[in-house]
Amino acid sequence: MELEDIRRDYSLGGLRRADLPQAPIELFELWLKQAVEAKLTDPTAMTVATVDKKGQPFQRIVLLKHFDSTGFVFYTNLASRKAQHLEDNSKISLHFPWHPLERQVHITGTAEKLTALENMKYFTSRPKESQIAAWASKQSSRLTARAALEGKYLELKQQFSKGEIPVPKFWGGFRVKIDSIEFWQGGDSRLHDRFLYSKDQDKWVIDRLAP
């Protein structure tokens, strides 16, 4: 399979320092809004990278569920591989690849667990099928067959057929507190625009990076 000639031009526009707000969350909100308006598939999907005790990195796609000036929020099984990694090392990075808009956003930071109240508020807002699935799946554990998972799901569906479904103790969210956030916009002749916001106490320092 020949890969050398697979490429394309980037021509949707550049990013200039004059376009940048002082707070990166404002630009992220604008870009995410534009990704939604452009009807991109899964615009809130982000790559979440963590490392294990040996320093081996792992990545997976997770959906962003909330963001504001305090950080970026996602939810998971607290016994999952990513959650176990974060117990040992709270350093984390997030990546949003908005290819059709020729944009990327890369975030580094530290992950902190959400409160039980925050977990409950989001869990109860989910469709019932998703709530049951959270109970059924021991995320990242080995399965003998898919039938075992489906059987457990059906068993729990019957068990929780009436009334509210409680929040599993092994399920919850993380808030990624931002250390840095980079905005990448494709440019002509591979002269891409990259701007890095780095946290310096209570203010943001903005640097242009070479493509």
UniProtKB/Swiss-Prot annotation:
* Keyword vocabulary terms for this entry: Flavoprotein, FMN, Oxidoreductase, Pyridoxine biosynthesis
Query: Binding residues for FMN, per the UniProt record?
Result: 60-65, 75-76, 81-82, 104, 139-140, 184, 194
Q: Name one GO molecular function term.
A: FMN binding
Instruction: Report if keyword Oxidoreductase is assigned.
Output: yes
Cited InterPro entries: Pyridox_Oxase (IPR000659), Pyridox_Oxase_CS (IPR019740), Pyridox_Oxase_N (IPR011576), Pyridoxamine_oxidase_dimer_C (IPR019576), Split_barrel_FMN-bd (IPR012349)
What EC number(s) does the entry state?
A: 1.4.3.5
The UniProt record gives the binding positions of substrate as 7-10, 65, 122, 126, 130, 190-192
Primary role: Catalyzes the oxidation of either pyridoxine 5'-phosphate (PNP) or pyridoxamine 5'-phosphate (PMP) into pyridoxal 5'-phosphate (PLP).
Q: How does it assemble?
A: Homodimer.
Protein family per UniProt: Belongs to the pyridoxamine 5'-phosphate oxidase family.
Q: Which NCBIfam families match?
A: pdxH (TIGR00558), PRK05679.1 (NF004231)
Its name, as the record gives it, is Pyridoxine/pyridoxamine 5'-phosphate oxidase
Its source organism is Aliivibrio salmonicida (strain LFI1238) (Vibrio salmonicida (strain LFI1238))
